[in-house]
A protein has these predicted regions:
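Conserved Rossmann-fold NAD(P)-dependent oxidoreductase catalytic core, especially the SDR/UDP-sugar
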Residues: 74, 99-143
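Active-site helix of classical SDR
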Residues: 143, 147-150
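Conserved N-terminal Rossmann-fold NAD(P)-binding element of oxidoreductases
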Residues: 3-7
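NAD(P)H-binding glycine-rich loop region in Rossmannoid oxidoreductase-like domains
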Residues: 54-93
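N-terminal Rossmann-fold NAD(P) dinucleotide-binding loop
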Residues: 12-13
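C-terminal substrate-binding subdomain of Rossmann-fold SDR/epimerase-dehydratase oxidoreductases
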Residues: 201, 205-315
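Rossmann-fold cofactor-recognition segment
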Residues: 43-56
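NAD(P)-dependent short-chain dehydrogenase/reductase
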Residues: 156-212, 218-222, 255-257
Length: 315
């Protein structure tokens, strides 16, 4: 496959790495690509990079033509609180960017578009099951999730109206080796924690910030996306991508102590041992139809993440 990935951040870079490893040709399309970061994650010269704005439809179409792209993965956009910090910029980046991705794919008759949404679109107040399924209730509760849900509707509309082959991936809270520029609370907490362990520094987990949550390693999300690019004749168009496990701050502290017994890790602001826990994502359909199964439990993910950070420190 010839794949164009919009967004060269945490998810985009790891998706590119795995796609290249699998034999695909990859181009990353990003407004301000961090080339040093991409060299570390993807590898030097292993993927082409185009510095351009998702809101520039002609630039996107030009990139599709130049690199003879047949598959588009759309990860670009502002995340989390960054959308609310400038609502106009956030909305135009996230919604217009999705429209441009879909329109470019339609005009160039691409074989598939994979849109990366978020598990934040689920309306937890209306879900009572032990695990969250793809068909459960959705609803936007902040500007970020509204833009993602709006984008999902656009994706479905292009499939229904134009026959565009699309798949939506809804990942849990993603963490891993990334150049965080703000917005991802989970990602930044995990980064700060991993860096503290690597440096041998004490670390405090604020339970009011890191509430019970499902987190998933970027390498697992990248696997789900690449599987979505490859699957033939999918039975549905939306798939969860998580770890299938909800962890609280005390769980996180315990795992860190197992990995690094000499590190001082404290939890503050904890309620009655995280008594209110959200349900994990149901991964049964993703496994059955995509072949997705997370390879990294949280402990293994943190170990792998720290090993990469240690390697960066040595270099």
């Amino acid at each position: 496959m010839n794949i164009l990935i919009t967004g060269a951040g945490l998810i985009g870079a790891h998706t590119a790495r795995q796609a290249v490893d699998g034999g695909s040709k990859v181009v990353l399309f990003d407004l301000a690509p961090n080339r040093e970061y991409l060299e570390k994650v993807v590898g030097k010269g292993r993927a082409d990079v185009v510095a351009a704005d998702m809101r520039d439809l002609p630039a996107l179409i030009s990139a599709l033509d130049r690199f003879q792209v047949d598959t588009l993965v759309h990860t670009a956009g502002l995340i989390g609180k960054r959308v609310a910090e400038n609502s106009y910029t956030g909305a135009t980046n996230n919604i217009l960017g999705t429209i441009n991705a879909l329109e470019a794919a339609r005009l160039r008759k691409l074989r598939r578009v994979v849109y990366v949404s978020t598990f934040g679109v689920y309306d937890r107040a209306k879900i009572s099951g032990s695990a969250v399924r793809e068909g459960d209730a959705v609803g936007g509760h902040n500007l970020y999730t509204v833009t993602k849900l709006c984008s999902e509707h656009l994706v479905h509309s292009y499939t229904e109206q134009y026959g565009l082959d699309t798949i939506i991936i809804r990942p849990a809270g993603v963490f891993g080796r990334g150049h965080y520029v703000g917005g991802s609370t989970v990602g930044m907490i995990m980064r700060d924690l991993a860096l503290a362990v690597v440096k041998g520094d004490p670390f405090t987990i604020d339970a009011k910030v890191y509430a019970p949550n499902e987190v998933v390693y970027a390498k697992d999300v990248a696997s789900a996306i690449n599987l979505a690019c490859q699957v033939k004749n999918p039975k549905q168009r939306t798939y969860n991508a998580g770890s299938g496990v909800v962890t609280g701050p005390q769980d996180l502290a315990r795992i860190v102590k197992e990995l690094a017994p000499n590190i001082d890790v404290k939890v503050t602001g904890a309620s009655a041992e995280d008594s209110v826990k959200s349900s994990p994502l149901d991964l049964s359909v993703s496994k059955a139809e995509l072949g997705y199964a997370p390879r990294y439990a949280l402990k293994e993910a943190l170990r792998d993440y720290m090993e990469e950070l240690w390697a960066d420190q040595r270099n």
